[in-house]
Each structure stands twice: as C-alpha cells, then as structure tokens.
A protein has these predicted regions:
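Charged/polar low-complexity intrinsically disordered segments, enriched in acidic residues
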Residues: 133-190
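Short amphipathic alpha-helical segments
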Residues: 1-4, 188-192
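Tandem repeat scaffolds
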Residues: 1-143
Length: 192
C-alpha cells in the first residue's frame, strides 16, 4: 500500500544501527535509508517499491515474500543473507557486494549482468528480460482483476494492478506457479 498522506519519515534511516529487528508486513515504499546497518533483521511480506537503501549493510538478514520494484541498493553489502519468494524488477545493484547470499524461488525481471552471473548456479530462480506481456493474461482473468480495482486497498498495493489500466503480470506469474487460471478466477473475487 502506498504511503500517500502518511508519514514516510518513520522508515527513513540515516547512519543508524537497526540490529535484530523484525520488519514484517512493513511498507518501505519511496523511503530513503543511507549508511544504515540492518544486521540480523527479518523482512517478511514487505514492500520495497521505489525505496532507496544506499550503502546499507544487510548481514545475516532474511527476506521472505518481499517485492523489490524499482529499489535502489547502490553500494550496499549483503552477507549470509537469504531471499525467498521475492520479486525483483528494475532494481539497481550498482557497486553491491554479495557474500554467501542465497536466492530461492525468486523472480528477476530486467536484471543486470552482475545479478545474472550471481544466479548462474542457482536454477530454482526465474530470470526474464521483462515481466510477461499484458496480452498473456486470459480475458476472463483480466475481467476479474479489473473488477478488483474498486477495492481501494488492493488497487493502492499494486499487487495486481500497475500504472494506468495495466495488470501486474510479474505477480500473476508468481501466482501461476501455485494456481491455475480457473482457480484464480474463482479465488480472487473472494478477497475482501
């Protein structure tokens, strides 16, 4: 969910030590953190959409079910860090150092050569040049997803909807690894 009208400063950190923290179900959308130490922290079901984490340290951290869309990790350091069931799209990894970092069942769209080389021996991840095209969504599923635009929370979370009238096909690709089109057509309208 976007932080429109909310205080983004609560998740903006500069030169801080945030050790052993649990950032579960947090929204770091459009926040800015610089030179911050997040060692031994857990990030679960967290959104990092358009967030900046420049020159931050992530030692012994775990990221589960997170989305990194347009996130900037320039100069950050990841050591003994695990990423599981995460989506990476248009993420900046300039000058990032990875040491003993593992990715499991992650989706990468538009990844740099640096990340592709890192993932070369990890075959349980999906690496694509771009998210699937909009026309790959079946008309019946598109109709169900469009009907959910009336739900303000779902629409602002960008989980199913992109900018304008587009559909977030990256999330749909992840959902299709678990559910069929028919199951999604049946289950998505049940979201409150």
């Amino acid at each position: 969910m976007s932080l429109v009208g909310k205080n983004r400063a609560i998740f903006n950190y500069k030169n801080q030590k945030l050790l052993n923290r649990n950032f579960l179900y947090k929204d770091f959308e459009k926040t800015k953190s610089y030179r911050t130490n997040f060692s031994n922290s857990k990030f679960g079901s967290t959104s990092f959409r358009a967030a900046h984490f420049k020159y931050c340290s992530f030692l012994n951290c775990s990221f589960a079910d997170c989305d990194f869309i347009g996130t900037n990790f320039r100069g950050s350091y990841f050591s003994t860090t695990t990423f599981e069931n995460c989506i990476f799209s248009s993420v900046v990894f300039d000058q990032v150092k990875f040491k003993n970092t593992s990715f499991k069942n992650c989706y990468f769209f538009g990844s740099s050569a640096h990340i592709q080389a890192l993932l070369s021996d990890m075959d349980e991840n999906t690496v694509l040049p771009a998210p699937p095209a909009q026309n790959t969504v079946s008309p019946a599923l598109k109709e169900v997803i469009d009907s959910l635009r009336t739900n303000d929370i779902i629409r602002r979370s960008h989980t199913l909807h992109g900018k304008g009238e587009s559909i977030n096909t990256a999330t749909l690709l992840m959902l299709h690894s678990i559910y069929t089109d028919e199951q999604l057509i049946t289950l998505l309208p049940l979201i409150p």
